């Protein structure tokens, strides 16, 4: 999920609330369920019209790549009783190859490149935003990929539906940072999700995470480093402030007490997307994490 597009700011808060209200009203008028009620989500759902090219991609490729596991029209929840198990994986992908799940696949650049490079591995892209799903459909369809599927699903619900040992790897690259202190509970990396991912991973399976936000890197360490059942495989030593500073206060972090943390070399299975290029051009440091199930 590319956070430069999806992160709310103070100036957009009123507009965001209006859009959310409009979405609920629109869903009710169409007979569709309003999404999620009071659940804490890692994203803000905004309706976005597809341009002609993306609409054609959706119409052409959705039946091939988009999983039909949603609770209903317009819902990002998993339908009641759905189980993501080996039988479903075998039926959907047509084989029992290892499965890699990317949370927040954005425009699909990374997951499509990975699927094309590794035809003996199955891939599932999780993305909630219509344009991102449509663009991933377009890229996958152009290459006629057989080993990729897409689910427009709230990621934590998919992992709750997954059976033990069904997934080889999970990727979460550049998630929405939710920089305001009061929004940290919306960050996708949370203990509850980590527990579900741990259960769903195969033995020695890994969760790969990357962020270009220093404060989010600290958050990842706080959530993941002391969890039973995960080992931080990082071999690099990185110095980070040990306190959160919140949105707009990044300059204050340099004066805070720092500590050393273990992080990984850049994952060579991640393509250099336009989003990552922008972060590097802005002088941001990329933090990579590899947490292995033990």
UniProtKB/Swiss-Prot annotation:
Its EC number is 2.1.1.33. NCBIfam families: tRNA (guanosine(46)-N7)-methyltransferase TrmB. Signal peptide: none annotated. This is tRNA (guanine-N(7)-)-methyltransferase. PROSITE patterns: SAM_MT_TRMB. InterPro entries: SAM-dependent_MTases_sf, tRNA_(Gua-N-7)_MeTrfase_Trmb, tRNA_methyltr_TrmB_bact. The active site is at residue 176. Keywords: Methyltransferase, S-adenosyl-L-methionine, Transferase, tRNA processing. Belongs to the class I-like SAM-binding methyltransferase superfamily. TrmB family. Pfam families: Methyltransf_4. The keyword S-adenosyl-L-methionine applies. Catalyzes the formation of N(7)-methylguanine at position 46 (m7G46) in tRNA. One of its GO terms (molecular function) is tRNA (guanine(46)-N7)-methyltransferase activity. GO terms for cellular component: tRNA methyltransferase complex.
């Amino acid at each position: 999920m590319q956070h430069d597009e999806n992160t709310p700011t103070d100036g957009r808060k009123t507009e965001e609330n209006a859009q959310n209200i409009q979405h609920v009203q629109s869903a009710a008028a169409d007979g569709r369920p309003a999404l999620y009620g009071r659940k804490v989500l890692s994203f803000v759902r905004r309706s976005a019209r597809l341009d002609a090219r993306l609409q054609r991609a959706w119409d052409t490729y959705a039946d091939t790549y988009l999983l039909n596991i949603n609770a209903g029209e317009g819902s990002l929840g998993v339908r009641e009783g759905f189980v993501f198990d080996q039988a479903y994986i075998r039926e959907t992908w047509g084989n029992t190859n290892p499965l890699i799940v990317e949370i927040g696949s954005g425009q699909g650049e990374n997951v499509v490149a990975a699927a094309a490079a590794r035809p003996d591995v199955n891939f599932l892209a999780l993305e909630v935003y219509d344009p991102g799903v449509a663009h991933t459909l377009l890229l996958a369809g152009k290459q006629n990929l057989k080993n990729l599927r897409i689910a427009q699903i709230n990621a934590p619900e998919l992992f709750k539906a997954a059976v033990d040992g069904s997934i080889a790897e999970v990727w979460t690259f550049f998630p929405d940072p939710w920089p305001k202190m009061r929004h940290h509970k919306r960050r996708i990396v949370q203990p509850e999700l980590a527990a579900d991912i741990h259960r769903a991973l195969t033995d020695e399976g890994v969760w790969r995470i990357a962020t270009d936000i220093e404060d989010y890197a600290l958050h990842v360490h706080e959530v993941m480093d002391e969890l039973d059942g995960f080992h931080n495989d990082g071999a690099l030593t990185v110095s980070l402030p040990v306190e959160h500073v919140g949105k707009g206060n990044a300059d204050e972090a340099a004066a805070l007490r720092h500590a050393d943390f273990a992080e990984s070399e850049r994952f060579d299975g991640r393509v250099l997307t336009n989003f990552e290029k922008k972060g590097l051009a802005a002088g941001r440091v990329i933090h990579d994490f590899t947490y292995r199930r033990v």
